[in-house]
Every structure is written in C-alpha cells, then in structure tokens.
Amino acid sequence: MSEEQGRGDGGLRPISGRMAVEERRAPGGALLEPWDGVWPSVDPSAWCHRSAVIIGDVVVEAGASVWPTVVLRGDQGSLRVGAESSIQDGAVLHATRGLSHTVVGARVTVGHRAILHGCIIEDDVLIGMGAIVLDGAVVERHCVIGAGAVVGAGKRIPAGSMVMGVPGRVVRALRPEEIAAWIAHGHEEYLRLTRLLLGEAAGAALGEPGP
C-alpha cells in the first residue's frame, strides 16, 4: 500500500509495516488516543495543553481546561471532566477496571500533581496540590481537600467540609466566605485563562494577534 492510499483510508497511514491510527487533537493541541476503539471526546470550548495525555473513554465538557503534563487515562474505566473544571499541571485521573470510574463535576479545581483514582468529585470542589482521592470515595460539593491530603477508598466527605492530613479527615466546616474565596475564585480565574487561550488559538488560526 502506498502512503497516498493509506491517507485515503479514513486518515490511516502505514508505519513500519502496520496501520497507524489517525491523528486527532483537542483544542490546545493535546493528542487524543483511542483505547479498544473508544476515542476521547473533548468539547470545542474546552482547552487541553499539547503536552497532556488523553486516552480512551474520556469526556471533557464545555469550558474545562487540562494543563501541561496531565494524564487522563480512560483505559480501565471511564473518566469525565465536568463543565468549567480545571485539571492542573501533572495531575493524573485513572480508574480500576470492573470496579470504578472517575467523575469530576462542574467548576472543580484539581490542583497540581493531584491524583483522582476511581472517585466521584461533586460540583464546586477544590482538590489541593498533591492530594489523592482513591477508589469509591465521594467528595460532596463545596469541599476543600487540602494539599497532600489522602481521601481513602470508599470514604464519603460531607458537603462543605475542609479535609486535611494522611489519612484525610474532616477538620471543620467551611464558611461561606471561604467557599467564595477558595473555590469560586479559583474556578473563575482558570475559566478566564481558558477563554484567553482559546481566543489566542482562534486568532492564530485566522492569522490575527491574540488578545
């Protein structure tokens, strides 16, 4: 088969005697890779940095952002990143086959190098830098999981809680002004950055300077 014939077959091309998968990229440049025939789905209004890795059964919803070196690996269970959520540098989302999926709700901030494995994070939550949330855990809305905290498998964190430590424990309830300052402000700032980057990308595609 010639190289030209390969390109005509659904975008596939031969490499070293085998057929390579067509290349798909998310807004922002992240390479999307299929797993067992399932491709990631990224909303056109989301932004995913070109160094992020997004594999398999992954959904990234409108306005969400995925930052440098993030890994979203949907090979063992499905992953969903909710609308206007940010997955920050070096974070990893994964699951356990036959046991769990990972769901991140809307307007969630997942800090640098955090790990979410087979858990559910409800809307309007802040996951601190380096925090870990394990299989079957549920973090209800308006929670802050402190930097480096570990939420154990199967644990449920009540709405409006501050969690700290290893193992993670609820240390107190959050005040309304803390929810506004830590959770809402973080969401708004990363949404602003996402829209800025999407605007720059659109301008570059048209040959225009960014904002």
Which residues does each PLM region occupy?
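N-terminal segments that cap or nucleate solenoid repeat domains
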Residues: 22, 26-66
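Glycine-rich hexapeptide-repeat left-handed beta-helix
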Residues: 2-41, 75, 81-84, 89-96, ...
